[in-house]
Amino acid sequence: MVVNKLSLDKFLKDKITGIIIIIASLILGYLLISLYFTNHFFFQTHINGVNLSLRAYEDADNLIRDNMEGYELQLIERYGETEFITGKEIGLQYNESNSFTKIYKDQKSLQWISSVIMDQSYYLEDLYTYRNDKLEKTINDLLCMNRDILDPKNVCYQYVDGAYKVIAEVYGNKIIKNKLREEIKKYIMSGETRLDLSETSCYDNPMYLVSSGKTSVTMNLLNKYIATRVTYRFGKQSERLDGTIINKWLEVDKNLDVLINKTSVMRYVNELSKKYDTVGIIRKFNTSTGKTVEVKAGLYGWKIYQEGETKALLDIIKHGEVIEKEPIYTQKALSRDGNEIGNTYVEINISKQHLWFYKNGKLIAQGAVVTGNPNRGNATVVGAYMLNYKQDGATLKGIGYEVDVNYWMPFFGNMGIHDAKWRTSFGGEIYKRRGTHGCVNAPYYLAKTIYENIESGIPIIIYEE
């Protein structure tokens, strides 16, 4: 038992001794390496791009000088072009009064182990000097700064065969000059020898590419808009609006937002108005006396509400609707066919001073009237008008007169048909001597019959033979 105990003690003692020797050797080795680094650079040490790993401090100057000799910076340009800037042409020199010594003075030799796994890169702004005027001239003389400029272009869209397709972006060759100057100076001072102008964003690039997410969103929106189909109905006639016209109204801005040109939409609606509005047109009218006259001017007829229809059409396009509709009107006639007057109307013959009222094609009432005095500048207007409204009992006022009437039916401003109880006779030549201020005076029975059978919007046709 004693022998075994002695053997175990000896084993443990030898083991501990071995461990101590190993630790001591490691410490000694670490210290010896640290001693080496008291005048040498650490592993992975680079200063302004020059590799000084494990180099003696005293050799660093020469190594940096040697690296500077024959220095040139290669510019990798778009479309495979390359150019060079040499140290010689810009007066590149080693700066004798640089702050280089600060790097190795700050180096702690005992901390060398960190350099095994960590890069020790340094940049000194004062390591080199160059002639700024020469560098500026060299930069300004670069071919990439003087080529014909091809501006970058975003993706764009082309309408072809009823649909839009994407036209790829153009990168162009437009240099961002200040950016290029900054990068060249930085690369020279860093000792870099290769400058890729594309990778360092020295070109003015398009904002949106074929691969951009918004590109497809915009194309889908364009195709949605041109899928719109609007059939406008004008009685028996129609107008069809579709993508063949709408595509000319669409614009895509620099942010790839789709704009509908409101002015173009307004022009389209205006053209519809010019073609289909009938207010003030010349109408052929078959009179009660058997003649056919031309009725000119007036306020009766169809009139498109251009502002309202423009707004409605813009909304239809934005929703890509397929729709059949009438335009929005400020006023409508009774019919789109023929002269649009239909078979319910009031007819007033100024020359004969006579009025007829037809309802659903039947003569309801007729009689002599008195119209405006033309000799005093108060002639009743001629043309096609319509009843604005009717009023039971009204007081009519004007310069030098004020009268009460039982039936008031205006058709143009303050002109209207009404009864005139102060008159004892109608028709003939009365209107030329004692005519009205423009209104149509009718006997009580005639005014009453018209009033009881007429509604607003009914045509009132006034003419001279």
Question: How would you label these PLM feature ranges?
Answer:
Residues 2-403, 407, 454-456, 461-465:
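Surface-exposed, secretory/extracytoplasmic low-complexity segments enriched in Ser/Thr/Asn/Gly/Pro
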Residues 380, 398-465:
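Exported/periplasmic cell-wall-interacting domains
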